[in-house]
From Swiss-Prot:
It comes from the Eukaryota. The keyword Plastid applies. This is Small ribosomal subunit protein uS9c. Belongs to the universal ribosomal protein uS9 family. Keywords: Chloroplast, Plastid, Ribonucleoprotein, Ribosomal protein. GO terms for cellular component: chloroplast; small ribosomal subunit. GO terms for molecular function: RNA binding; structural constituent of ribosome. PANTHER family: RIBOSOMAL PROTEIN S9, SMALL RIBOSOMAL SUBUNIT PROTEIN US9M. Transmembrane segments: none annotated. Residues 166-191 are annotated as: Disordered. It holds the Pfam family Ribosomal_S9. PROSITE patterns: RIBOSOMAL_S9 (PS00360). SUPFAM superfamilies: Ribosomal protein S5 domain 2-like (SSF54211).
Length: 191
């Protein structure tokens, strides 16, 4: 299977390398399924799948409703992890290698990497990944609908408006000599 798009996302100490390939709709993080790697954390799963949701043209109801019960939550998890669709749509495998940082830093690095890869996928000039050859893209919702790839500027604008292409440059401040931590000093004694 040919790699359609590659991108890198960073957040704090985490670095995520994202590859999008033709396949059968798998979402793999460090050789594990996304749900297993992210420990079934609902926020992390939503954040990782968010760039795909932006591409969805259908206006769906909010996934988190006030009457959210355990069964609704379980069905939402299964909907998040299913990549199913029509016969004429193209399925993509998303393969991520991530290291460094904690779970939330890795989640945000993966989200940035996926967003960048989707932008590259839409602007790719490779004949095997041309818009004419890949007419539809899978949305990771269990509804079974596929989305026609709009032009690159539309995808970029949608992702940029949601803030998924903006890299968060905040990192931990270095420790200074003479201090306990970056800014914490030992207790001051006047006498």
């Amino acid at each position: 299977m040919a790699i359609l798009a590659k991108a890198v996302g960073r957040r704090k100490e985490a670095v995520a390398q994202v590859q999008i390939k033709e396949g059968n709709g798998l979402f793999i993080i460090n050789n594990k399924s996304a749900q297993e790697y992210l420990h079934n954390d609902f926020y992390s799963l939503l954040a990782v799948k968010a760039p795909f949701d932006v591409l969805s043209t259908s206006k769906k109801a909010d996934m988190v409703s006030p009457d959210l019960s355990l069964t609704n939550l379980e069905s939402t998890f299964t909907n998040l992890m299913q990549f199913s669709g029509g016969e004429n749509a193209v399925k993509f495998d998303t393969i991520v290698k991530v290291k460094g940082g904690g779970l939330m830093g890795q989640t945000e690095a993966i989200r940035l990497g996926i967003s960048r890869a989707l932008c590259l996928l839409s602007t790719n000039t490779n004949p095997s990944a041309n818009q004419n050859n890949l007419p539809n893209i899978y949305i990771p919702e269990g509804e079974g609908e596929a989305l026609a790839i709009p032009n690159a500027s539309d995808i970029r604008k949608q992702l940029k408006d949601k803030g998924y292409l903006t890299q968060d440059s905040r990192v931990k401040e270095r420790r200074k000599y003479g201090l306990k931590k970056a800014r914490k000093a030992s207790q001051y004694h006047k006498r």
